[in-house]
Amino acid sequence: MGRTPCCEKVGLKRGRWTAEEDQLLANYIAEHGEGSWRSLPKNAGLLRCGKSCRLRWINYLRADVKRGNISKEEEDIIIKLHATLGNRWSLIASHLPGRTDNEIKNYWNSHLSRQIHTYRRKYTAGPDDTAIAIDMSKLQSADRRRGGRTPGRPPKASASRTKQADADQPGGEAKGPAAAASSPRHSDVVNPGPNQPNSSSGSTGTAEEEGPSSEDASGPWVLEPIELGDLVWGEADSEMDALMPIGPGGTTRLPSKGLARSAARPRWTTCSTWTGMASRPICGAGRSRTSTARSCGRPPSRWKLLLLLLLRRRPAPRTIASWRRSRLGSCPTRSDGSGHRTDQTDQIIGSRVLARSLPSRGSWFRWPNNWEKNSTARAVKPPPCAPDVDACRVELLRI
């Protein structure tokens, strides 16, 4: 419902003020002060509402109210302040001593608003114009009362757009080594081929400098620390990246520290092995968790955790062999120097390329009885007298 306006009360006088009422109001305020405007009319003996008494006193009866017409200089100040502040008549009146906000508003609406366009064409800003100093403390205090934004503070949308524009600039300054080391979630693509030396200087490169041919020849190596219980995989705590198989019977040594960072995002090779492992339960681990294979980007975190659990557990060899035989039937094959036919697939475990060129049938894993954190993966070429193994077998051995 709200409070009933005081002017609607029965018996109150409305309309023009008489000289006797002005005298009663001026004498009471001179003796007792303004006080409460709601109780002032009754105490002063006036049949007026409190709002009418307040407006009459502030706009007409005060001693510091300036009488007479508004001068030409005051018009210039009003126009310039209105162009800066808008319809904030109280702030404009604070720069014109003796003039009330109501008087300035009425003068603007009745005279200046009609002549503003002619005035702007006639009076252009020149070097001899008098500058108007705006009291910023009053402006900020008025903003706090009205709930406006403090001057000088940009909106959130503009700030976010500015940050996005700075991030999208290709010619921006490169981040320092401290900033690069503060984000361990971002992986590095390391390709120690002839086109890119293994240097520890931390120099950056581009995708065009690396070339796609070297990556296809040796495969993508992605280094990213992973922690699961007491098993920690990383650049400093793991030796899993020490030996990287590149084919039947061959290994490549990778540096564990001081790897060159690349500006390109890590690219993951999608093959039938990845798709099969991502769409089927992992070696009968008890729970069927699946993830979607992607041709670009980083594999899901749950995919890494499941593969780490696969290393820690000891599944039956027949499960892996049967699963490998069923999932690798459509993989492309090649023939190496020894006459064995192997599959060009990548076995990715815990964001590491564990082994390549796994056989399509008859493959088996030999798991150690006691798993240690410091372990490595080796690709051992099978002897010629082993007809049941086509190309190689992966052994996890203790150091």
Swiss-Prot record:
Instruction: Name the GO terms of the biological process aspect.
Output: regulation of DNA-templated transcription
This protein's superkingdom?
A: Eukaryota
Report one GO cellular component.
nucleus
List each copy of the HTH myb-type domain by range: 9-61, 62-116
The biased composition feature labelled Low complexity covers 170-184, 191-206
What keywords are annotated for this sequence in UniProt? Answer: DNA-binding, Nucleus, Repeat, Transcription, Transcription regulation
Q: Where is this region: Disordered?
A: 138-222, 242-262
MF-aspect GO terms = cis-regulatory region sequence-specific DNA binding
First-listed, main subcellular location of the protein, grouped into a coarse class = nucleus
Q: State its role.
A: Transcription factor postulated to regulate the biosynthetic pathway of a flavonoid-derived pigment in certain floral tissues.
Task: From the Swiss-Prot or TrEMBL record, give the protein name.
Answer: Myb-related protein P
Q: What organism does the UniProt record list as the source?
A: Zea mays
* Gene behind the chain: P
